[in-house]
């Protein structure tokens, strides 16, 4: 999955680059954007900054999801610790209760024993009491062993909980380290945004200077046009200057050819330079047509040269002045071309800086993708570890349930046996009461049977209490096991839903990728078609130019009408150019407003990111406080464990004391039996 995500991200980066190139080509082809090419860099930087800022919210969302998962795990571990505490408390209370029951039973039996007054009782009753005491001692030892086993299991569970807590502490430290890294990355993003703002301001300043130069050049062009109109009237008379103008036009044509070759090498500046060259070519063609007309007029005027020699001398002074003005205009045009070349160099530098920034952004995206992959791998490992732990707990609970069920079956068998013995004793008592009191031996048998009944009832009560406790434990264990199974099922369902959503996202991304590839292929085909059309148009234009030159050489008389029409068209073109300048100014103002809006939106996003950072800081502080609380709870749990160990030691001491008392009681019983036998022998002797 990680490799597929990397491939998809790389393909998205490539597609974004292709779309940017297509947007740039579309801007160059748009006729409304011919004179606003310097603003393209600013638009690209703004779009890049917006794209970079749009890439941050999904990362923050994933980070918040990871924090929510960690919070859920914390709550789950806290609940588990509480359940373990409750289980320990129940074990302690059961141990204390069993100890109190044993103590009460032993004390009652010791109090019930006669120390010298019951000489007339039977020896068989003493033997039965001794057996009962021995059975009770065995039961007490079994319960002691069972309590020790419970204590060992509780200690093992506490050790496992401590291990889980240590693992959680390490994960929390890693999480804090990742938070610091993300803060550093956000600081870097803020610095980059500041740099982009500075670059945008510089670009705006350069655009303002460029607009000023363009307006000045337009003013100079208008002045030059006025001067050219005046020079046209003078050129009709000045025949000698026609050859010099033809040489100048040939030099300009050679320069234009060289410029066309340079423009073919530079793809990014091709369209803007072509348009400027076309404008210059149109002006040169106009000049050539006017020069042809002037040549024709010069041929006509050669016949009247003798008449106008005097006027030529007067006009030579004017021609010299016009030549000086032309030379000044040419120098100004050269200066304007140098300024344009400097502006183009600055644009190239800005584009190089933007490419470097894009490379740095791609590196940042790669680092972020690596961080996301590491977080996903950690989450999977945690889920697998929790699954294994729950499976182990479920197996342990099943084993405990089976053991408790076996104990319950054994205790039910003992109860059934006691009930059968009781019924047999009751039947014997009924028989004895029916037969009546015949001998003292029968009376003794009745007392023995009565004592047996009492012992059976006591054992029955004890076994019933134990059965109830065992059933309660079984119910609690079943409830706990069902809850844990339901939790594990919920976790599995959540994981399955997450996997399905990721698969759907991958399919959707692949579909989008195919669509974008198809669109890119269509765009490439369209660009190739447009290039072919442009080449064909250039060829057609060249053919038309050649045919027009031949037609101009043939149709000399129709140029006067065409001159008038061209003057009208020039006026209309001037009006149109003014309208275009106004439209360009409007578009420039609109671009300024849009840049302001984009900067405001970027600032709003930065402020929102700052607020999210503060919220995340508060969240991390809350997590740290929760970790401190968890540490305090662990310390309290350790104290409770020590207290439970002390209680267990006390219980062991009490059990040892009870065993000693039982041993002393057995000795006393043996002494009493010996005394009773002696007394019985003495009574027999006296009777004899």
From Swiss-Prot:
Modified residue annotations for N-acetylalanine: 2
| Tissues expressing this chain | Detected in small neurons in dorsal root ganglia. Detected in C-type fibers of sciatic nerve (at protein level).
Q: Which GO terms describe its biological process?
A: cilium assembly; clustering of voltage-gated sodium channels
InterPro entries under this entry?
Answer: SCLT1
Gene Ontology molecular function, alphabetical: clathrin binding; sodium channel regulator activity
Q: Which residues carry this modification: Phosphoserine?
A: 681
Which parts of the chain are coiled coil?
A: 59-673
Tell me the subunit arrangement. Interacts with SCN10A and clathrin. Identified in a complex containing SCN10A, clathrin and SCLT1.
Quote the function comment for this protein: Adapter protein that links SCN10A to clathrin. Regulates SCN10A channel activity, possibly by promoting channel internalization.
This chain's protein is named: Sodium channel and clathrin linker 1
Source gene? Sclt1
């Amino acid at each position: 999955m990680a490799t597929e995500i990397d491939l998809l991200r790389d393909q998205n980066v490539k597609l974004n680059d292709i779309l940017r190139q297509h947007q740039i080509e579309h801007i160059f082809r748009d006729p409304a954007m011919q004179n606003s090419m310097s603003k393209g860099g600013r638009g690209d930087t703004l779009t890049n900054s917006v794209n970079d800022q749009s890439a941050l919210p999904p990362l923050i969302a994933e980070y918040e999801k990871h924090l929510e998962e960690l919070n859920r795990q914390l709550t789950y571990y806290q609940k588990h610790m509480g359940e373990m505490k409750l289980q320990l408390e129940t074990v302690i209370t059961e141990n204390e209760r069993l100890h109190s029951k044993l103590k009460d039973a032993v004390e009652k039996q010791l109090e019930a024993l006669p120390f010298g007054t019951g000489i007339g009782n039977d020896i068989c009753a003493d033997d039965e009491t001794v057996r009962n005491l021995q059975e009770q001692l065995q039961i007490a030892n079994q319960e002691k062993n069972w309590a020790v086993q419970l204590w060992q299991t509780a200690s093992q569970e506490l050790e496992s909980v401590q291990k889980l807590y240590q693992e959680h502490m390490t994960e929390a430290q890693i999480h804090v380290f990742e938070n610091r890294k993300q803060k550093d990355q956000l600081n870097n993003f803020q610095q980059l945004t500041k740099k982009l703002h500075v670059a945008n301001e510089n670009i705006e300043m350069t655009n303002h200077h460029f607009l000023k130069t363009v307006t000045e050049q337009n003013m100079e062009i208008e002045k030059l046009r006025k001067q050219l109109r005046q020079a046209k009237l003078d050129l009709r008379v000045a025949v000698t200057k026609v050859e010099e103008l033809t040489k100048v036009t040939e030099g300009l044509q050679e320069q234009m050819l060289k410029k066309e070759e340079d423009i073919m090498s530079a793809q990014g500046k091709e369209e803007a330079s072509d348009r400027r060259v076309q404008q210059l070519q149109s002006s040169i063609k106009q000049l050539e047509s006017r020069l042809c007309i002037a040549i024709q007029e010069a041929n006509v005027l050669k016949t009247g040269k003798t008449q106008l020699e005097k006027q030529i001398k007067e006009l030579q002074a004017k021609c010299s002045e016009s030549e000086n003005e032309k030379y000044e205009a040419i120098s100004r045009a050269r200066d304007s071309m140098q300024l344009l070349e400097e502006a183009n160099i600055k644009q190239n530098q800005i584009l190089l800086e933007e490419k470097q920034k894009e490379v740095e952004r791609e590196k940042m995206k790669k680092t972020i993708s690596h961080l996301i992959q590491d977080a996903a791998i950690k989450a999977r490992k945690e889920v697998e570890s929790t699954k294994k732990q729950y499976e182990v707990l479920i197996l342990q609970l099943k084993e405990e349930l089976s053991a408790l069920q076996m104990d319950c079956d054994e205790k039910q068998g003992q109860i059934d046996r006691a009930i059968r013995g009781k019924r047999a004793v009751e039947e014997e008592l009924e028989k004895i009461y029916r037969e009546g009191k015949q001998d003292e031996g029968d009376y003794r048998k009745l007392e023995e049977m009565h004592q047996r009944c009492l012992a059976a009832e006591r054992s029955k009560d004890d076994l019933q209490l134990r059965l109830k406790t065992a059933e309660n434990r079984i119910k609690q264990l079943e409830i706990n096991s069902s809850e844990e199974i339901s939790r594990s099922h919920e976790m599995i369902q959540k994981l399955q839903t997450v996997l399905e959503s990721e698969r759907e996202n991958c399919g959707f991304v692949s579909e989008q990728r195919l669509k974008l590839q198809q669109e890119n292929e269509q765009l490439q085909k369209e660009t190739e078609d447009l290039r072919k059309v442009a080449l064909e148009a250039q060829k057609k234009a060249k053919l038309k130019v050649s045919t027009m030159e031949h037609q101009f050489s043939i149709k000399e008389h129709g140029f006067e009408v065409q001159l008038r029409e061209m003057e009208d068209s020039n006026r209309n073109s001037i009006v149109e150019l003014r309208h275009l300048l106004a439209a360009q100014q409007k578009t420039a103002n609109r671009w300024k407003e849009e840049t302001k809006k984009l900067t405001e939106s970027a600032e709003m996003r930065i402020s929102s990111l700052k607020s999210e950072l503060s919220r995340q800081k508060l969240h991390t502080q809350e997590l740290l406080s929760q970790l401190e609380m968890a540490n305090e709870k662990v310390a309290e749990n350790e104290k409770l464990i020590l207290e439970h160990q002390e209680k267990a030691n006390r219980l062991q001491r009490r059990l040892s004391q009870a065993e000693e008392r039982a041993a002393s009681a057995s000795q006393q019983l043996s002494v009493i039996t010996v005394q009773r036998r002696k007394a019985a022998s003495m009574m027999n002797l006296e009777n004899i």
